[in-house]
UniProtKB/Swiss-Prot annotation:
A GO-annotated cellular component: cell outer membrane
Subunit details: Component of the lipopolysaccharide transport and assembly complex. Interacts with LptE and LptA.
Protein name: LPS-assembly protein LptD
GO terms (BP aspect): Gram-negative-bacterium-type cell outer membrane assembly; lipopolysaccharide transport
Compartment(s): Cell outer membrane
Signal peptide: 1-24
Cited InterPro entries: LipoPS_assembly_LptD, LptD, LptD_C, OstA-like_N
Task performed by this protein: Together with LptE, is involved in the assembly of lipopolysaccharide (LPS) at the surface of the outer membrane.
Domain of life: Bacteria
Keywords carried by this UniProt record: Cell outer membrane, Membrane, Signal
């Protein structure tokens, strides 16, 4: 049944793409349906401004009474009242004088905030307090209208009896709130309602003795729109956000969520902004996970998240990015705004930095919570101290000097792994030269590193050299030039040729005595090094490994180049980059041949972008392994994007098993074969109201679905409803998650409902739909 339903949604998306209906800005359409204030807004105290009255007939009994009849038109500042009969009554004398105006036989009142019509009105001219009967009201410049049997209009609020409210445009009562009493606060932009009934198409669906509702853009505490759905993991679920506007610079959202398969999950988020910084603190907690297929020891599932950015004084900065979950399966089992299973790890960092024009330093703490099933995780850097110094224009402007220094202490949760202090200094001297033909940069650098190491505390821990010194000099020569010509094989275009030549030399140093030698469960090298991914731009990097513990030898030339095509408006429409490293000697880090380059050349690397038209974009990258005579890595993306949020994207990814094995240590590759994945994303604002999003990813090598999603959303000016169906891979059979040895999928269905028009912002919701999922939409083009 689920598959048939899903196919129906997919078919709807496919056929809707061929709709001839164009998309118009929904917000502009909605604003066109509400009254706008005509003329220039008059500033100042309206009560002190003169009153102008026009009428067909006037009877004056000065100073106590005046009667105006026939097409009565009264203006004062931004206020404008039209009625058939108006009476002005004055009583008292001097400071105690009281003036009242009575509109009879129907009236029409307008100002820059509200339009009001009714049968009769009484206006206290001293205070402008107004009482009306059988009134209809419409906000000016924003959505919101209704009626009231009687209304008291005051400077700061409107008190309505037997009243209604809706944000729908005139002649549309898709939803409406009826209340025995309603108080609308003008400056605070919210309404209180007592004995409120929520109606949909005239049918009562909800009653509450008290309700608060925003009627503007200001934040207000209260219930937000809930969401509900079902999932094979969670069962039926219901989520109810509760918003608390603590202060102008503090707010919080609490979201209880009930899942029939798992129980209650309590979620909360606190946001703050003060003189020293801004940030967000969030938590998710499920006390007892009742899901029958979850076999983890810890039934209490939780998440903590903290992001903070602060400016301390003029030159100090503090940054915190901390995410911690109860178990490795958390992001696979729960959809969260604070992480994803595709990330592979949760970051836990804090950094305090000081900046000056030519130097800066920072002290930080860094660790990662890895979700892979590994017995030895990454190292923690507790603490890490970095220092950078820059001095340009030395030797009469010929040389640039830079110094990077670092001290860091490494710890590991595994008692088998060693701990260490690492002290590193990296001075460099650059001789940059450039003219209209190109640039030449000669750089010399020295890597000076000292380690103080201790073996792991376990009796099975391997012995390790306690003190290690490493000194590696480096020289790099980088030459670039740009050649341009308007004589190309494509008429109307200017072509550039940009050759890029680099020579890099760094002598070999055996670094096998840095960190663990034998533990194959550790996924890195040393303490913080890992083999970097390769592409065209990586050909010109100094190092093959991240971190500082593995600095490979180098005696190599990098040959590369880029060609670009520009149209007559100087817009870049196409580029192609191609390059390769030529090794004069193997690049090594130790005596293990698996860690060295083999052959005299690296893979060919290619990158290309092509803007075929204003609507069509293509991007591709390709690597060819000359040693194995096979493709090692490839990906391509083609996108049709005729309008802002309308797009169709096709993509393909490939990585050979040899490439994966080269970049990951033993046991890290769970596929044990090539990776071949195809995918497509479709998003279309079919008309003024309909939004469709579809996504499909399939692993060809495994012949397994990765993710498929279809969502439909219908928007009007005052409400929207969205439904979505999703099926995605939760885990593979070698995960210790379930006794079921087959691949595990989660099938889910969700529905969202939203009241719109309560503020000025209108949007289709298509961006939010694209951001969800295992593989959210990415626009990879740079043309």
């Amino acid at each position: 049944m689920k598959k048939n339903y899903y196919s129906l949604i997919s078919f709807s998306i496919f056929t809707a793409l061929y709709s001839t209906a164009g998309f118009a800005d929904l917000q502009q359409q909605c604003l066109a349906g509400v009254p706008q204030f005509s003329g220039e807004v008059v500033k100042g105290n309206a009560n002190e401004m003169p009153v102008y009255i026009e009428a067909d007939k006037a009877e004056l009994n000065h100073p106590t009474k005046g009667v105006y009849q026939g097409n009565v038109d009264i203006k004062q500042g931004n206020r404008h009242l039209i009625t058939e009969t108006a009476e002005i009554i004055q009583s008292g004398q001097d400071e105690n004088v009281q003036r009242y105006a009575y509109a009879k036989g129907g009236f029409d009142y307008k100002d820059n905030i509200i339009n009001l019509t009714g049968d009769d009105a009484k206006v206290h001219l001293n205070t402008k307090d107004t009482d009306v009967k059988n009134a209809d009201y419409q906000f000016v410049g924003r959505q919101g209208r209704g009626s009231a049997q009687s209304a008291e209009v005051r400077e700061d609020y409107r008190l309505l009896n037997n009243a209604t409210f809706t944000s729908c445009l005139p002649n549309d009562n898709s939803w409406q709130i009826e209340a025995k009493e309603m108080k609308q606060y003008i400056k605070e932009e919210y309404a209180e309602m007592w004995h409120a009934r929520f109606k949909v198409a005239g049918v009562p669906v909800f009653y509450t003795p008290y309700l608060q509702l925003p009627i503007g853009d200001r934040r207000r505490s209260g219930l937000l729109i809930p969401s509900a759905g079902s999932s094979s993991r969670d069962g039926y679920w219901y989520s109810q956000p509760i918003y608390w506007n603590i202060a102008p610079n503090y707010d919080a959202t609490f979201t209880p969520k009930y899942m029939t398969h798992r129980g209650w999950q309590m979620n909360g988020e606190f946001r703050y902004l003060n003189e020293i910084g801004e940030g967000k603190i969030a938590g998710e907690y499920l006390g007892d996970d009742r899901y029958k297929d979850y076999i983890g020891d810890n039934k209490s599932r939780h998440l903590f998240y903290w992001a903070h950015n602060a400016k301390l004084f003029d030159n100090w900065r503090l940054n915190v990015n901390y995410t911690k979950v109860s178990d490795k399966r958390y992001f696979s089992d729960f959809d969260s705004d604070y992480g994803s299973s595709t990330d592979g790890y949760a970051t836990q960092t804090a950094r305090l930095a000081y900046f000056q024009p030519n130097y800066n330093f920072a002290i930080s703490a860094k660790q990662y919570q890895v979700f892979d099933e590994v017995s030895v995780g990454p190292y923690k850097a507790l603490p890490q101290i970095d220092f950078n110094y820059y001095q340009n224009d030395l030797a009469q402007g010929l040389l640039d000097f830079k110094l990077f220094a670092q001290a860091v202490r490494f710890e590991n949760d595994s008692t088998l792994m060693p701990t260490a202090w690492r002290y590193h200094a990296e001075p460099s001297l650059n001789l940059p030269m450039s003219n209209q033909y190109g640039s030449l940069n000669v750089e010399t650098k020295l890597y000076a590193t000292h380690y103080e190491q201790r073996k792991g505390s376990s009796a099975r821990a391997e012995d390790i050299d306690r003190s290690v010194n490493r000194m590696i000099p480096q020289i790099k020569v980088d030459l670039q030039t740009v050649l341009a010509s308007d004589k190309t094989f494509v008429d109307g275009f200017t072509q550039t040729l940009e050759p890029h030549l680099q020579y890099l030399y760094r002598p070999y140093r055996d670094q096998s005595n840095i960190g663990s030698k034998r533990n194959t469960e550790y996924l890195g090298y040393g303490y913080d090094s890992a083999l970097l991914q390769q592409d065209y731009f990586s050909l010109f990097r100094d190092r093959r490994y991240s971190g500082l513990d593995r600095i490979a030898s180098a005696n190599q030339f990098t040959l590369g180049g880029t060609t670009r095509f520009y149209d007559e408006q100087a817009n870049e429409r196409f580029n192609l980059s191609l390059g390769q490293i030529l090794y004069l000697n193997d690049s090594r880090i130790d005596n293990n041949s698996d860690h060295s380059t083999s052959g005299r050349a690296s893979s060919w690397a290619l990158e290309s972008n092509w803007k075929l038209s204003d609507q069509w974009n293509w991007r591709g990258s390709y690597q060819y392994d000359t040693r194995l005579n096979e493709t090692s890595l490839a990906n391509t993306t083609l996108e049709y994007n005729p309008e802002k949020n309308n797009l169709i994207q096709l993509n393909y990814r490939y990585a050979s098993q040899a490439y994966i094995d080269q970049n990951l240590t033993s046991g890290a590759n769970r596929y044990n074969q090539d990776i071949k994945q195809i995918g497509t994303t479709i998003a279309w604002e079919v008309s003024d109201n309909w939004v469709l999003v579809g996504r499909y990813y399939h692993d060809i090598a495994l012949n397994k679905l990765v993710e498929e999603y279809a969502g439909i959303k219908y928007n009007t000016c005052c409400w929207s409803v969205g439904v979505g169906a999703r099926r995605h891979l939760v885990s593979k059979s070698n995960y210790t998650y379930s006794a079921n040895k087959d691949t595990i999928y989660d099938n889910s269905f969700g529905i969202t409902f939203e009241l719109r028009g309560l503020g000025n912002e209108q949007h289709s919701g298509i961006v939010d739909m694209l951001d969800k999922g295992m593989l959210p939409y990415v626009k990879p083009f740079n043309l």
